[in-house]
Amino acid sequence: MSLDVYIKYKQPKKRLIKRGFDGAACGSTIAMYEKDTEVEETEWHANITHNMNEMAMHVPTYYIIDGEVYDSDLYMILWRPEEIGIGNICNNTDVVAQGILHGMTYMMEHRNELLQYNPDNGWGSYDAFLPWLMDYWKACVENPGCEIQTWR
């Protein structure tokens, strides 16, 4: 099981796929292209194992809506944004990026404390979660004001 995150682009983005295989990061969808092909993408997508939600619950962060600061944790920002008002008010890249950035800062400063929340089953880790967050944050910053949808 995983958390799937989608950033819906305001305008489709063109991407050139080189001849060969192309697929999602998780490897669940792969296509073979006989020649270089230009495609239009309408969203950015990434997923992370649900096993990281316990670690995310122990990462304090905050977000700002209409000038008001709200304390939260990374779990609520990532897994349940609609329950803290982000989804209902402005579930968008601008708000979520703030929470992710503050959460990543905390994670980097408290790495050793957070390692205890690495899943016992080996599915997911601090060392995989932080780069995933960096990619998500970067996608938010590169796509300001875009809607985010989460599926869990």
Residue spans of the language-model regions?
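Acidic (Asp/Glu-rich) sequence patches and key acidic residues
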Residues: 1-152
